[in-house]
UniProtKB/Swiss-Prot annotation:
Residues annotated for Mg(2+) 2 binding in this entry: 495, 497
Function, in words: Enzyme that cleaves 2',5'-phosphodiester bond linking adenosines of the 5'-triphosphorylated oligoadenylates, triphosphorylated oligoadenylates referred as 2-5A modulates the 2-5A system. Degrades triphosphorylated 2-5A to produce AMP and ATP. Also cleaves 3',5'-phosphodiester bond of oligoadenylates. Plays a role as a negative regulator of the 2-5A system that is one of the major pathways for antiviral and antitumor functions induced by interferons (IFNs). Suppression of this enzyme increases cellular 2-5A levels and decreases viral replication in cultured small-airway epithelial cells.
Modified residues (Phosphoserine): 216
Catalytic residues (positions): 495 (proton donor/acceptor)
Keywords on record: Exonuclease, Hydrolase, Magnesium, Metal-binding, Mitochondrion, mRNA processing, Nuclease, Phosphoprotein, Transit peptide
Residue spans of biased composition, Basic residues class: 90-99
Listed name of the protein: 2',5'-phosphodiesterase 12
Source organism phylogeny: Eukaryota, Metazoa, Chordata, Craniata, Vertebrata
Any one cellular-component term (Gene Ontology): mitochondrial matrix
Protein family: Belongs to the CCR4/nocturin family.
Record gene name: Pde12
Region annotation (Disordered) ranges: 90-111
Length: 608
């Protein structure tokens, strides 16, 4: 069972919130002493919103100018209340007429229906005194005030914690964590309360065991029972297969709670794929590392924009079951794999924008990580860091071609490249980017780290382009780690599309590359752009040189690395890669048990 740390502070209030939440979500037979009027009022917006339910059952949402006198807002509320009474009376009369026309029993009363002919009295009270009608809305609607409409009183709640977004994944599998996408205003997910229920087929549940009432679309509503999980994340078990899930949640901010909400999964829990390639790796990463260690992950997760092409299905990955290439399926595997590493830093490549915001952020945030994103064209880079260990100080992302053209740091390199216009054109056409995040330790402010993440040009004959891109990257990293933050350690992750035998890898590890290296003519003599390059870092591949980090039907090789600065960091342990038997169980990658054509690199680093 997946559980979140740091929840003990909420235990004391959870039972109170749950009792209130159940009352709110229960049947309408229980009448509350005072209704709720929710006011949203923020200084940056000209209007405030007011939300409440009238006695006729209708729900009113009003937008009023903050600078408007209270009297006008109260007058509008009175008008709405009068309309509500009129609708109730009209509905009663319509039902009576239908009864007469269908031969139904006559009503005992023969007189006309009573209809409200005047607006109800509407007042706003604060500390038991009526608020003057010339007071502006922004000042009148205070938290704890009481709105009275006729005989009905409403407690005013100004800016309570509120869910602005609440969504469950479309595809849910047994054994894989379910992470709802949350948006909370005036609150935070960590201070909110969650309770999970699972469906029981009609006739299979005892009435006393059911949870909140269902609003199922089926002819017979489902019954619900508690799962016993009261955390943000729920991992369904095999017994849940075929059942839908329900989440009951109450937003909070550590001081108070807002209106509860419920949502149900659209589809029932599906069976999982069984053992995945990363399950054995998780045995090495059961716990978050201590403060002196930095568990780092680098992973090309295979962008959906590439996985869903006809070329991918028929040429690149014809051995992969089509459903296993679907994003909804792969997201379950990616989320489980990443959260199971308990990493402090995660650098991802080939991240679709929607995957970042709708899948990765909700999942990793629930496990204590925060992320930043850099778009390339159709996909981009994402870096996540553990909030309990690091805070983000600054970002220094660049596009290689833009930096090469406009940044004075690369003026000399551009002049050399311009000696071969054809090569220069090819380099400047590439859209590759570099993501740099400077992080500061939350426990020792003197400890900072430069985390770089990139995905270099992919073409097999693009060796010289990757050399130029790496030179731009290292110069920019030097500027950040030596000029802006002198002496901070460097971790450089990515898919470098270069095996250990290439010029790019030799350049990084040895610190220089000669102008006569064969990679300068990787696409023929007409594009040769020979030049000597060197850099000041002492870098090492933290995970060594595995036989492969990319394994597809027509190719396998080591393309991914976590480069570290040997002067400031050392490797504590490398998490073993999946065995060759695991990788080839379904011929190659991706597969039903592995979500990408790449394999994640995972290692524990240590400050020197």
């Amino acid at each position: 069972m997946w559980r979140l740390p740091g929840r003990s502070a909420l235990r004391g209030v959870r039972s109170v919130v749950e009792r209130r939440s159940r009352a709110e979500a229960g049947t309408h037979e229980a009448v509350r002493a005072m209704e709720r009027a929710v006011v949203r009022c923020v200084p940056s917006e000209p209007k405030l919103s007011l939300s409440f339910a009238l006695a006729d059952g209708s729900h009113k949402n009003m937008q009023r100018d903050q600078s408007e006198p209270l009297g006008r807002a109260l007058s509008r509320i009175a008008t709405n209340a009068l309309k509500g009474h009129a609708k109730v009376a009209a509905a009663k009369k319509s039902r009576k007429n239908r009864a007469h026309s269908s031969g139904g029993a006559a009503c005992e009363a023969t007189g006309p229906e009573p209809v409200a002919t005047c607006e109800p009295v509407v007042k706003l009270y604060y500390r038991e005194e009526a608020v003057a009608e010339d007071v502006l809305n922004v000042d009148a609607w205070q938290d704890g005030a009481v709105l009275q409409i006729g005989d009905v009183k409403y407690k005013v709640e100004r800016n309570p914690p509120t869910f602005t977004e609440l969504q469950l994944p479309r595809y849910i599998m047994a054994g894989f964590p379910v992470c709802p996408k949350l948006g909370v205003e005036f609150g935070d997910p960590a201070s909110s309360v969650f309770r999970w229920y699972k469906e029981v087929k009609p006739g299979a549940a005892e009435p006393g065991d059911s949870g909140p009432a269902s609003s199922s679309h089926s002819s017979q509503p489902s019954a619900w029972i508690e799962t016993g999980v009261d955390e943000r994340v729920y991992t369904p078990c095999n017994a849940d297969i075929g059942l839908r899930l329900r989440l009951h949640c109450t937003p909070g901010n550590g001081q108070r709670f807002g209106p509860s909400r419920e949502l149900e999964s659209l589809c029932p829990v599906e069976a999982g794929p069984g053992t995945c390639t990363f399950d054995h790796r998780h045995l090495y990463t059961k716990k978050v590392t201590e403060d002196s260690f930095i568990r780092t992950v680098s992973y090309n997760i295979l962008a959906d924009t590439y996985a869903q092409t006809e070329f991918s299905r028929t040429v690149l990955y014809p051995y992969c079951a089509p459903y296993a290439l679907e994003l909804d399926y792969r997201q379950n595997l990616i989320q489980k794999e990443l959260t199971g590493y308990n990493a402090d830093l995660i650098c991802l490549q080939e991240v679709d924008r929607a995957v970042f915001s709708d899948s990765l952020v909700p999942a990793l945030e629930a496990f204590g990580l925060e992320g930043v994103f850099r778009i390339k064209q159709h996909e981009g880079l994402a870096t996540f860091y553990r909030k309990s260990k690091f805070r983000l100080l600054s970002q220094h992302d660049i596009s290689f071609q833009e930096a090469l053209k406009s940044d004075p740091l690369h003026k000399e390199l551009l002049e050399k490249l311009a000696l071969n216009p054809l090569a220069q054109e090819k380099v400047l056409q590439r859209s590759s980017v570099l993501q740099i995040s400077v992080l500061q330790s939350t426990t020792d402010s003197s400890k900072k780290i430069c985390v770089a993440n990139t995905h270099l040009y992919w073409h097999p004959k693009g060796g010289y382009i990757r050399l130029i891109q790496m030179e731009v990257a290292l110069v920019h990293i030097r500027h950040v780690s030596r000029d802006l933050y002198p002496g901070i350690p460097v971790i450089f992750c990515g898919d470098f599309n270069s095996t250990p035998s290439t010029g790019m890898y030799h350049f990084v590890i040895s610190g220089s590359i000669a102008e006569d290296h064969e990679d300068w003519a990787s696409n023929g003599e007409e594009e040769r752009c020979s030049m000597p390059l060197s850099h000041c870092f002492k870098l090492k591949s933290a995970c060594g040189e595995p036989a492969y980090t990319n394994y597809v039907g027509g190719f396998h090789g080591c393309l991914d690395y976590i480069f570290i600065d040997l002067n400031t960091l050392e490797v504590e342990q490398v998490i073993p890669l999946p065995s060759h038997e695991e990788v080839t169980t379904h011929q190659a990658l991706p597969s039903v048990s592995h979500p990408s054509d790449h394999i994640a690199l995972v290692c524990d680093l240590k400050w020197k």
